[in-house]
A protein has these predicted regions:
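Conserved nucleotide-cofactor-binding alpha/beta core module
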Residues: 1-106
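Substrate-binding/catalytic lobe of Class I Rossmann-like enzymes that use SAM or dcSAM, i.e.
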Residues: 90, 97-127
Length: 127
């Protein structure tokens, strides 16, 4: 979540948005801002974003806004068939690239790599 910017943008593109914040003080402030601005379709919680939100899964789309060495397995498992995950991932040369993973069936996924980027590091149990 951080500042809440991505969640606010996503709330205008999706019916419902779930966002996870690691820092309690950020979460409290973002909830206030969302309330003040009338964003009623954003659900927030504090936790480890690499674990996802299994109680609300499956998701049609997952957006990760920090870079990891790989896509966290819990997030992959929480994608709906046909769902997409977008995330910056570090490649074998140590550079970050945007990855789009699409769940094509219960067991299969397609992965595409796009432009080079620079994001903050992903933190958490599955980072």
């Amino acid at each position: 979540t951080g500042s809440g910017y991505q969640a606010a943008v996503a709330s205008r593109l999706a019916q419902e948005v779930y966002t996870i914040e690691r820092v309690e003080s950020f979460d409290a402030r973002v909830r206030e801002v969302f309330h003040e601005l009338g964003y009623t379709n954003i659900v927030c919680r504090i936790g480890d974003g690499t674990r996802g939100w299994p109680e609300a899964a499956p998701f049609e789309a997952i957006l990760v806004t920090a870079a990891g060495r790989r896509v966290p397995q819990p997030l992959v498992e929480q994608l709906a068939v046909g769902g997409r995950l977008i995330m910056p991932v570090e490649n074998d040369r140590g550079r970050q690239v945007i990855v789009r993973m699409t769940r094509t069936s219960e067991e299969d996924y397609a992965q595409e790599h796009f432009l080079a980027v620079a994001f903050v590091p992903l933190l958490g149990a599955f980072a």
